[in-house]
């Protein structure tokens, strides 16, 4: 037998500023299943994580709540830890980036980069809040859009017209924190020389460390040229002060990934068998894997490996990227009851049902995963209760009643047990490749065969026939052995079911290797229900509990519309005459391509077909469409005669039309079926 592998695994660090929701849980469940599989196979697999506990947002929320940042992150960590534990996510260590280990390692890495010439400084001009005595990030500045005059817009992008601009272009700027008028000030910032690692990154990202789709996206960024990365923030800031630079702090994304190392170092202090340098030192032969979402690929596939390389540390063996979660085919929505917190789910349903559903849908790619609540109920009830647990419930009673709970030594269908045995390597390969969906399909196919065998032999009918009790015992003993095999294959996904099954089977904790043997002349414990069907009423109750309160009344002035409708929130604009309207050329447009804009928080770049020509349009709809490829092939409406506007990212040749207040609530408009690209909208 080969030596056990030594593997260190991490998930992205949850931000210590809010609750965990089911979108977050997708990643932690995915990672936990892979880690449990490795341990199931006998490998030494360590799973560490931490709360991402630094940044202005945490500092400001703590101030608003009248507590210290340290109190806030301690409260959030307790909440996160409970959610993870109750979802059966089993970390070897869950730490915090606000720790002595992280301070020490962040300083060490920074000094190594600085001493190697990879840190530069230059002056940056930013808005400064004179009341709060702090520099303002773009999201903390609001004012009037310089393009369309919409009020209350962010410092870099207008959510109403989609325009982008520098914060200094904003009219009547105000601090979103204090309401004060900001002033421009210069400040020394520190930059990591990312372009110096261009050749290294081009090689590393094509060395098998990334999925092909991710490597291709990274190649686009590399081909467009890397920029120096600003790694500093000015006081006041909740984080670590940069060594030898009073009043200057590490940007949260500098010390956040170092939190992986810090959590492991904290564990090493309690585990003498673990050697920190064996996992993080240059040339380490152990394996290191990061599981992340596709929204933070640039930090993990560009900045992080470059930092490690520059600091003379090892780089990851692999970065495993997953897609976003949708619910019922749409982005999670509070108003629809599909923005579901982890705790809200746990208040209504067992964790293993969601673990199995995620496993049944998770492939090895970066495609988004949809949690369809009707399909969720059907799949769990059909697969787990109707197939897997059903085998044990069908057979256990006959063994207890007819043979005092002792399984006879008999293999009533060798070809069936051989099929289970020969399927194991393929299921293991699927787990290893993170193709959980294939592992579940192949396991359920075996469950179907086991159920078909039991249905064919019908022990309930045999038991009524004189002299056929030995057959009943042989059939049911085989059924229990096949159930045991299925539990072994499902244990990384369903650890509680496995533990309950082990008690019923009266066996030690099952390992993967146990699939090669059968129980014979073995005493079972009394059987009790291992799982119950999902009642759709509980799913409905969960959705109801997730809905935000939409019944608040509006207290606007008498001239405002009554109630809390859209006109109350966004009153009608001043009237225009028909000629003004007729001057607007509205056209049907086909979205040929939709993609993220590097460096822009809110923009998507759309390539539009309007009949005889193509247009390039930048639109501030990214928050509502985080997976822009979903828009490709869709018809929309655009203002085609809007004067082209030069933007920081290129020329925008028009404006697409959308409704909604902004953020996640943006809805791109589409014409009725039958409309063709280029047709005028009248």
From Swiss-Prot:
InterPro entries: aa-tRNA-synth_I_CS, Anticodon_Met, Met-tRNA-synth_bsu_C, Met-tRNA_ligase_1, Met-tRNA_synth, Methionyl/Leucyl_tRNA_Synth, MetRS_core, MetRS_Zn. Keywords: Aminoacyl-tRNA synthetase, ATP-binding, Cytoplasm, Ligase, Metal-binding, Nucleotide-binding, Protein biosynthesis, RNA-binding, tRNA-binding, Zinc. ATP binds at residue 334. It is found in: Cytoplasm. Its main location: cytoplasm. Gene3D superfamilies: HUPs (3.40.50.620), Isoleucyl-tRNA Synthetase, Domain 1 (1.10.730.10), Methionyl-tRNA synthetase, Zn-domain (2.20.28.20), Nucleic acid-binding proteins (2.40.50.140). A motif ('HIGH' region) lies at residues 14-24. Belongs to the class-I aminoacyl-tRNA synthetase family. MetG type 1 subfamily. Is required not only for elongation of protein synthesis but also for the initiation of all mRNA translation through initiator tRNA(fMet) aminoacylation. Homodimer. This is Methionine--tRNA ligase.
């Amino acid at each position: 037998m080969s030596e056990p592998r030594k593997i260190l695994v991490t998930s992205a660090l949850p931000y210590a500023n809010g609750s965990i929701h089911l979108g977050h849980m997708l990643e932690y469940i995915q990672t936990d299943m892979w880690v449990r599989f490795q341990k199931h196979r006998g490998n030494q697999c360590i799973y560490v994580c931490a709360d991402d506990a630094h940044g202005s947002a945490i500092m400001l929320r703590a101030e608003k709540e009248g507590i210290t940042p340290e109190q806030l992150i301690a409260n959030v960590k307790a909440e996160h830890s409970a959610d993870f534990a109750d979802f059966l996510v089993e970390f070897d260590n869950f730490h915090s980036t606000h720790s002595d280990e992280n301070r020490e390692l962040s300083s060490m890495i920074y000094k190594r980069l600085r001493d190697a010439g990879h840190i530069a400084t230059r002056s940056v001009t930013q808005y400064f809040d004179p009341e709060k005595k702090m520099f303002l990030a773009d999201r903390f500045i609001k004012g009037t859009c310089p393009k369309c005059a919409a009020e209350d817009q962010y410092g870099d992008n207008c959510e109403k017209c989609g325009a982008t601009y520098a914060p200094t272009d904003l009219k009547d700027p105000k601090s979103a924190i204090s309401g004060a008028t900001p002033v421009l000030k210069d400040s020394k910032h520190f930059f990591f020389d990312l372009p110096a690692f261009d050749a290294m990154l081009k090689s590393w990202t094509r060395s098998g460390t990334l999925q092909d789709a991710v490597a291709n996206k990274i190649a686009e960024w590399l081909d467009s040229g890397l920029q120096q990365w600003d790694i500093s923030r000015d006081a006041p800031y909740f984080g670590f002060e940069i060594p030898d630079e009073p009043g200057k702090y590490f940007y949260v994304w500098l010390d956040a990934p170092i939190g992986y190392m810090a959590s492991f170092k904290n564990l090493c202090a309690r585990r003498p068998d673990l050697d920190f340098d064996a996992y993080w030192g240059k040339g380490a032969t152990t394996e290191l894997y990061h599981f992340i979402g596709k929204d933070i690929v640039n930090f993990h596939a560009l900045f992080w490996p470059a930092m490690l390389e520059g600091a003379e540390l090892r780089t990851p063996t692999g970065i495993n990227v997953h897609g976003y979660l949708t619910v019922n085919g749409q982005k999670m929505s509070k108003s629809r009851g599909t923005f579901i917190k982890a705790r809200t789910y746990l208040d209504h349903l067992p964790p293993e049902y969601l673990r199995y559903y995620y496993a049944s849908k998770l492939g090895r790619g970066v495609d988004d995963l949809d949690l369809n609540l009707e399909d969720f109920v059907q799949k769990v009830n059909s697969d787990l209760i109707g197939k897997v647990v059903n085998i044990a419930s069908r057979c256990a009673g006959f063994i207890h009643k007819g043979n005092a709970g002792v399984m006879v030594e008999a293999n009533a269908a060798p070809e069936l047990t051989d099929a289970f045995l020969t399927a194991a390597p393929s299921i293991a390969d699927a787990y290893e490749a993170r193709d959980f969906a294939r592992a579940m399909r192949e396991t359920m196919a075996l469950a179907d065969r086991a159920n078909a065998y039991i249905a064919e032999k019908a022990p309930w009918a045999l038991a009524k026939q004189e002299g056929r009790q030995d057959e009943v015992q042989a059939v049911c003993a085989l059924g229990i052995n096949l159930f045991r095999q299925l539990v072994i294959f499902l244990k990384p996904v369903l650890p509680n079911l496995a533990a309950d099954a082990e008690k019923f089977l009266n066996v030690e904790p099952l390992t993967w290797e146990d699939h090669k043997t059968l129980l014979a002349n073995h005493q079972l414990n009394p059987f009790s229900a291992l799982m119950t069907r999902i009642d759709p009423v509980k799913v409905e109750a969960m959705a109801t509990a997730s809905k935000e309160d939409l019944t608040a009344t509006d207290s606007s002035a008498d001239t405002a519309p009554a109630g809390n409708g859209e006109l109350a929130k966004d009153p009608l604009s001043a009237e225009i005459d028909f000629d003004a309207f007729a001057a607007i050329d509205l056209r049907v447009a086909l979205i040929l391509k939709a993609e993220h804009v590097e460096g822009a928080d809110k923009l998507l770049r759309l390539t539009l077909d309007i009949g005889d020509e193509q247009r390039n349009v930048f639109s501030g709809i990214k928050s509502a469409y985080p997976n822009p490829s979903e828009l490709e092939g869709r018809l929309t409406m655009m203002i085609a005669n809007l004067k082209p506007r030069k933007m920081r990212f290129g020329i925008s040749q028009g404006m697409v039309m959308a409704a909604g207040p902004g953020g996640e609530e943006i809805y791109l408009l589409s014409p009725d079926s039958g409309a063709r690209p280029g047709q005028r909208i009248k």
